[in-house]
A protein has these predicted regions:
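Generic serine detector
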Residues: 48, 60, 73-75, 79, ...
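Generic alpha-helical structural context detector
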Residues: 72, 98-101, 107, 133-137
Length: 159
């Protein structure tokens, strides 16, 4: 936060920065105890604390990291996906990653107009993250969403 002074305006970001190791530990402990209590109250399920810790915390975190890292690797490989917009980088739109990344794989769109909260610019570009943000807006948890101006939707085709 010393490097990014704007973060000080957001208490939730300051909290996460201050307790960055506590949150994952609490999450892992919660996963363990869900399995532990499930075994205690519903033994017929055959669930244990170790199982829910591994599946709900360890493997899901590894999967999340790999999918996240795919965005900045796979979405910049010239032989993968397509480039709708001419940008100064090698960003690509990778449709088959869109469901796993909640729309983050519309990476060329993002590099072309990064101010938009919407990464799937067209109806056929699955962008689950945008739907989550729109739902948050309904509950007052998000505001000032930036759309995609019409002039950005129909640019000159890239080479």
């Amino acid at each position: 936060t010393e490097l990014i002074k704007d973060f000080a305006k957001y208490p939730e970001l300051m909290f996460l920065d201050r307790f960055d190791t506590v949150i994952p530990i609490l999450y892992g402990a919660t996963m363990f105890f869900i399995g532990y209590f499930a075994n205690m109250f519903f033994p017929e399920l055959g669930t244990s604390g170790a199982q829910t810790l591994v599946w709900g915390y360890v493997l899901s975190t590894v999967f999340l990291y790999h999918v996240t890292f795919c965005i900045n690797s796979v979405s910049h490989v010239d032989s993968v996906g397509n480039r709708r917009y001419e940008t100064t980088d090698h960003s690509r739109n990778v449709w088959w990653l869109s469901a796993l990344t909640f729309g983050e794989s519309w990476h060329n769109n993002h590099h072309y107009f990064p101010a938009s909260s919407r990464l799937g610019f067209f109806w056929w570009e699955l962008d689950l993250g945008y739907y989550v943000i729109r739902t948050m807006k309904l509950f007052g948890l998000a505001w000032d969403l930036k759309g995609v101006p019409e002039r950005y939707l129909h640019p000159q085709p890239s080479a």
